[in-house]
Swiss-Prot record:
One of its GO terms (cellular component) is lysosomal membrane. Keywords: Endosome, Hydrolase, Lysosome, Membrane, Transmembrane, Transmembrane helix. PANTHER family: PHOSPHATIDYLINOSITOL-4,5-BISPHOSPHATE 4-PHOSPHATASE, TYPE 1 PHOSPHATIDYLINOSITOL 4,5-BISPHOSPHATE 4-PHOSPHATASE. Its EC number is 3.1.3.78. It is found in: Late endosome membrane; Lysosome membrane. The gene is tmem55ba. It catalyses: a 1,2-diacyl-sn-glycero-3-phospho-(1D-myo-inositol-4,5-bisphosphate) + H2O = a 1,2-diacyl-sn-glycero-3-phospho-(1D-myo-inositol-5-phosphate) + phosphate. A motif (CX5R motif) lies at residues 126-132. This is Type I phosphatidylinositol 4,5-bisphosphate 4-phosphatase-A. InterPro entries: PtdIns-P2-Ptase. The active site is at residue 126. It is a multi-pass membrane protein. GO terms for biological process: phosphatidylinositol dephosphorylation. It comes from the Eukaryota.
Length: 270
């Protein structure tokens, strides 16, 4: 956030504010002087002038003369293009325009800093490594994205971690990374599900066979114990059906896990 660089470069700035920023957002960028109200705010720059001027350099001194200062050196305001006298202000980094009350730099930014102008025309100063700064004006508060400081060639994509697997259905090879005790993989080629290794489906089929055996014994005991009562109470047949349904379901799941195709890992990439 704000790094405390709030010392004004121009003591008598009004609305020409200088803010400080670091590598993140600087919501507390300092403003030099009380800002004007939004209704007296100058219009935004035209389409020929970019709204955000990154690393803005000071304009050169103009050989023209200002009517108020005689032969004093003047520069053009970066906002309204009016002439600003810099006589007696050479030691300052920025000067204030008397027409639009915005700041214009007359010196290069201090070492390690750069100038940035907000779309609201507020002149900000931030670190050269800053990627985002916030305008300090209460009626603006824009977040200005400056982008990477040292753009370069994109780093190569990291090598994927995992193993190449041969599908048990179509024998095509695909990459799989989620190796757990419950590993089922869907082949991206045939879209069928298979198991990575035989341990998981074998264990599941064993549990289903045991449950099927337990439900079969229970169903047989229920039928044998209620055979005579079922002749009188027809609702007992529903309990028989439920018990037999559990037997069929567990048997079907046991057969499903027993017949599941197994995909074999080929070699690791990590």
């Amino acid at each position: 956030m704000a790094d405390g660089e709030r010392s004004p470069l121009l003591s008598d700035l009004g609305d020409g504010a200088l803010g400080s920023g670091n590598g993140g957002v600087s919501p507390g960028a300092a403003s030099l002087g009380a800002p004007n109200k939004p209704q007296s705010f100058p219009p935004f720059p035209s389409s020929t002038q970019p709204p955000v001027l990154l690393s803005e350099n000071p304009p050169p001194y103009s050989p023209l003369t200002s009517p108020e200062s005689g032969s004093a050196p003047v520069i053009s305001c970066r906002v309204c293009q009016s002439l600003i006298s810099v006589e007696g202000k050479i030691h300052q980094h920025v000067v204030k325009c008397g027409v639009c009350n915005e700041a214009t730099p007359i010196k290069n930014a201090p070492a390690g800093k750069k100038y940035v102008r907000c779309p609201c025309n507020c002149l900000l100063i931030c670190k050269v490594t800053s990627q985002r700064i916030a305008c300090p004006r209460p009626y603006c508060k824009r977040i200005i994205n400056l982008g990477p400081v040292h753009p370069g060639p994109a780093s190569p994509d990291p090598q994927p971690a995992g193993a190449r697997v041969s599908c048990g259905h179509c024998s095509n090879t695909f990459l799989w990374t989620e190796f757990t005790d419950r590993t089922l993989a869907r082949c991206p080629h045939c879209r069928k599900v298979s198991s990575i290794g035989q341990r998981y489906p074998r264990r599941r089929s064993l549990w289903c066979y045991l449950l099927c055996l337990l439900f079969s014994i229970s169903a047989a005991g229920l039928i044998a114990g209620t055979w005579s009562q079922a002749q009188v109470y027809g609702g007992i047949y529903a309990s028989w059906a439920a018990a037999l349904l559990l037997v069929v379901l567990t048997l079907a799941r046991a057969l499903y896990w027993s017949c599941m195709r197994v995909s074999q890992p080929l070699h690791n990439l990590t």
